[in-house]
Regions:
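Secretory/organelle targeting and membrane-embedding segments
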Residues: 1-128, 133-476
């Protein structure tokens, strides 16, 4: 693990590896070799891992389980320019099969791999890399060319942790494992789709890094376009990774290039989130006082496939919003004729399917029902599926699933070269456009201008209670 003392390793990777160890899912003779620029020995690294597990492990810290895990942990310090890294690691890495995790900035990917190749450590090894996969289409293509000089595509695992979430995986089962669902999952029934990735935290201390990315590159290019591809893809010929990837690429290649008029970019100013004052983005250390980097994006997309032609897809993401929520909402078309006119309701509420990805994973379906009584009075109601209530278990964290799959060599939940480049191609016209940002206070729903990308109506409110919360509140 390169970057083994960094934030990602401590919050996600080490706790996930600990959970896999406790479950007996790591190779019996496997070792975990951490490397970073900090001068640490094996003991120091194990203590960092101990604190990370205590704070972030899904099932909590357990002394005996950790001691078994800690025996696998070793550490080698490296230099900032990676010189001599290969020779150091060659002495430490004796096992023939290696999974190399690059939890480092993208600019370090190629220098590290070239150093490892020179030491003979990339032969037979697989690598895992984190987003962003390039800065634009040109740099993404260049990165892939450079990676392929060191390792072949079949041994590259590009990780998007959203794909490791249970509900994202369940989306495929929900769609293709239920005849009723698949029959309504198209332009004949669906009027519009809204995809949301909302975060209630701001940039915090990552100002300098975020100035180089922004929400388009950080969230839209990967998380949101992956969710859209899974929502729109046709049934694959099998559940084989290549078959799944082919269908997702077809969707991405069918998206019309986004035009600047279909995009609203926003940037948060000082405000209050969950009762805490949040400084404005331009107040964060490392951010230009005149920055036009977007912390919010709302966008209209068109997917020109047989199933989805004419259906508008609206995607949005943002930092420092009123709540943390990731969901996909499919709004169905109105009924062709209102048979219940004169009952006090002028328009029936369209059916809606909601896939909740976080914070509480689940799926709900809203429909019209008659209220009890002598007269016909319609009211929207919901059927709700919650992972926590239905399975009485806590889903594994995304990194647990993804690390386990990478160890097994399973590419199903990872992103391929063609997907990465297709997603960048969609955004090229917007990335080349000089941005104008609309401001919104931290703790709000985002900029008012965001509604301008909608052909009709408004965005659904982020601050609404989840369907399962409402259902629980209504119980006696």
């Amino acid at each position: 693990v390169f970057g083994a003392t960094g934030d990602l390793a401590q919050r996600k990777l080490l706790p996930a590896l600990y959970e896999l160890s406790v479950q007996g899912l790591l190779p019996k003779k496997g070792e975990i070799l951490g490397t970073a620029t900090k001068e640490l020995g094996d003991h120091g690294f194990r203590e960092i891992a101990r604190e990370a597990v205590k704070e972030f492990a899904r099932t909590g810290y357990e002394e005996t389980g950790f001691e078994v895990f800690a025996k696998r942990l070793r550490y080698v310090s490296t230099t900032h320019d990676q010189s001599g890294t290969g020779a150091k690691l060659a002495k430490a890495m004796k096992l023939p099969h290696r999974l190399i995790y690059l939890a480092v900035p993208p600019s370090a990917f190629v220098p590290i791999l070239e150093e490892l190749k020179g030491a003979g450590l990339t032969k037979g090894s697989s690598i895992v890399i984190e987003k962003p996969f390039g800065h634009d289409l040109k740099s993404a293509v260049a990165l892939n060319v450079a990676l392929h000089k060191v390792v072949p595509e079949e041994r590259i695992f590009r990780i998007d942790h959203y794909l490791g979430k249970e509900t994202v995986q369940n989306l495929l089962v929900f769609r293709f494992g239920n005849t009723l669902v698949e029959r309504i999952w198209n332009r004949d029934v669906v009027a519009q789709v809204q995809l949301t990735v909302a975060e209630d935290i701001g940039i915090e201390s990552r100002g300098r890094l975020y100035e180089e990315t922004g929400a388009l590159r950080d969230i839209v290019q990967n998380h949101l376009l992956q969710l859209l591809a899974l929502t729109c893809m046709s049934p694959p010929s099998s559940f084989d990774p290549a078959a799944l990837r082919d269908e997702k690429v077809k969707v991405l290649n069918s998206i019309r290039p986004v035009q600047p008029r279909d995009v609203v970019r926003g940037q948060y100013t000082r405000g209050t989130v969950n009762g805490v004052t949040v400084p404005g983005y331009r107040e964060v250390e490392g951010v230009s006082p005149n920055s036009t980097t977007e912390t919010y994006v709302a966008m209209r997309l068109a997917v020109d496939t047989w199933d989805w032609a004419g259906v508008p897809f609206y995607i949005r993401c943002g930092k420092a919003l009123v709540t943390r929520r990731t969901e996909i909402m499919l709004y169905c078309r109105d009924v062709p004729l209102h048979l219940f006119e004169g009952t006090g309701i002028e328009r029936l509420t369209p059916n809606r399917v909601t896939i909740r990805i976080q914070p509480e994973e689940g799926i709900s379906f809203s429909f019209m029902a008659k209220q009890p009584g002598a007269t016909v009075v319609e009211q929207p109601v919901r059927m709700d599926f919650s992972y926590g209530r239905s399975f009485k278990t806590q889903p594994a964290e995304a990194y647990e699933r993804l690390l386990h799959d990478a160890l097994l060599g399973d590419h199903t939940l990872f992103i391929g070269q063609d997907e990465t480049e297709a997603a960048w191609r969609v955004l090229e016209p917007v990335l080349e456009n000089t941005p104008r940002v609309a401001f919104y206070p931290a703790g709000s729903e985002g900029p008012d201008d965001a509604n301008s990308v909608l052909l009709s109506g408004e965005w659904h409110e982020l601050a609404h209670h989840s369907e399962s919360e409402e259902a629980a509140a209504s119980k006696p």
